């Protein structure tokens, strides 16, 4: 029989949200268990293949104001938190460069009009800078003479996704987080089989928690679905970009994020598909051809990885935190394509809810974060408390 250990919080899922939450909660003094169905490298998570761009203004062209605001708050948190980690993580705030070929000039007008419609006016005025061809070359010498115009979105940034995942886990473990790897499919009520009894369960499983996010009554859209994202990693020592670059195109808009050691992450927008099979030849050609059109030296790059991952997405494309006060379960989901951009602010709010539950607050869903992010935190009732507590061993 498995010996049972008691914890304040059991976190299901060790992707980006789970690791951020574990690190925050253990530093607050909580006893934390982190349970993951796979291994510690995080290779099965959407965060593992992400470009990890921190670009709230650029994303405002395709996202809602809530994402922009969460992103602004999260970049501040990343700056502070990464400085506190004992392991260095690549992080920069040198801006985003947006370019387009002459025949696609109309895409620039659409891009800027969407930004101005969604982003805070002060953010646009502070960060948006129009460039002529000379200015593009001054910002990115590797692109000198290649584009007659561009936009610099100052202050935007990026980080090393895999370095962040490693550092967060290492720090959390050193602070005392108890980890269970290769746990398979685990629910809140099966934790005792792993030797875990927890006062509060924080569910950060992404698509692994699909059953807990059903469709709305009478609705046909799934409460949580996966949207396919495709990313190529290449080694391109002859390119020499210094910041993320977005290439506007009516059919194949791409982003290219330079990482340390001449690595580049090349990706595009998501596909409306639950398919997680390997990348198609067509997709690979589109991404790599677009990169080659940005800089011909990508033609000599070495392809290291062709990655596919599904991003957990709610019908409104916004993140949500659901709080079952009776069952003492908090669920975080729906970070969609904005994981690294918004995860710090979202998990900070979720950890505030968990902290309120641990303190016995009868209205844990109404923490100050609920006022800051209206509608993101929702009180729900999933199951009778006594039944769930009996299953998890909380009543003894």
Task: Locate predicted features.
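Short beta-strand to alpha-helix junction loop
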Residues: 62, 66-72, 103-107, 151-167, ...
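Dinucleotide-binding Rossmann-like beta1-alpha1 core, especially the glycine-rich loop
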Residues: 51-139
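C-terminal catalytic lobe of FAD-dependent flavoproteins
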Residues: 301-396
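Helical element adjacent to the flavin cofactor pocket in flavoenzyme catalytic cores
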Residues: 147-198, 204, 208-211
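Active-site substrate-recognition segment that forms the wall
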Residues: 23-27, 37, 48, 53-54, ...
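Helix-loop-beta segment of a Rossmann-like dinucleotide-binding subdomain
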Residues: 87-101, 124-174, 269-273, 330-333
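Conserved Rossmann-like nucleotide-cofactor binding loop
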Residues: 17, 40, 208
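N-terminal Rossmann-like FAD-binding beta1-loop-alpha1 element of flavoenzymes
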Residues: 7-33
């Amino acid at each position: 029989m498995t010996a049972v250990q008691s914890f304040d919080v059991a976190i299901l899922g060790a992707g980006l949200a789970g690791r951020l939450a574990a690190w925050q909660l253990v530093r607050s003094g909580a006893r934390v268990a982190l349970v993951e169905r796979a291994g510690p490298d995080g290779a099965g998570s959407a965060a593992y293949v992400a470009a990890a761009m921190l670009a709230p203004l650029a994303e405002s062209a395709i996202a809602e104001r809530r994402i922009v605001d969460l992103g602004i708050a999260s970049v501040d948190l990343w700056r502070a938190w990464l400085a506190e980690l004992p392991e260095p993580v690549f992080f920069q705030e040198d801006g985003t460069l947006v370019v387009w070929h002459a025949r696609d000039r109309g895409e620039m007008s659409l891009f800027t009009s969407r930004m101005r419609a969604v982003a805070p006016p002060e953010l646009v005025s502070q960060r948006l800078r129009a460039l002529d061809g000379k200015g593009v070359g001054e910002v990115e010498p590797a692109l000198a003479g290649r584009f007659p115009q561009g936009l610099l979105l100052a202050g935007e940034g990026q980080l090393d996704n895999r370095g962040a995942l490693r550092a967060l886990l290492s720090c959390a473990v050193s602070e005392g987080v108890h980890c269970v790897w290769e746990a398979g499919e685990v629910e809140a009520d099966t934790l005792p089989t792993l030797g875990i009894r927890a006062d509060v369960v924080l569910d950060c499983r992404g698509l692994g928690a699909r059953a807990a996010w059903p469709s709305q009554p009478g609705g046909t859209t799934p409460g949580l679905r996966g949207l396919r994202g495709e990313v190529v990693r290449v080694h391109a020592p002859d390119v020499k970009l210094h910041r993320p670059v977005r290439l506007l195109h009516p059919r194949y808009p791409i982003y290219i994020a330079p990482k340390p050691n001449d690595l580049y992450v090349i990706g595009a927008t998501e596909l409306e598909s639950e398919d997680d099979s390997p990348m198609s030849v067509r997709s690979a050609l589109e991404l790599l051809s677009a990169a080659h059109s940005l800089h011909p030296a990508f033609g000599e790059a070495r392809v290291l990885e062709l990655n596919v991952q599904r991003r957990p997405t709610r019908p409104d494309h916004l993140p949500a935190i659901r709080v079952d006060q009776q069952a003492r379960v908090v669920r975080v989901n729906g970070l969609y394509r904005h994981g690294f951009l918004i995860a710090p602010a979202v998990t900070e709010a979720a950890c505030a809810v968990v902290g309120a539950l641990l303190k016995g607050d009868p209205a844990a869903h109404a923490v100050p974060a609920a006022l800051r992010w209206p509608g993101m935190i929702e009180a729900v009732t999933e199951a009778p408390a006594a039944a769930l507590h009996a299953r998890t061993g909380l009543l003894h």
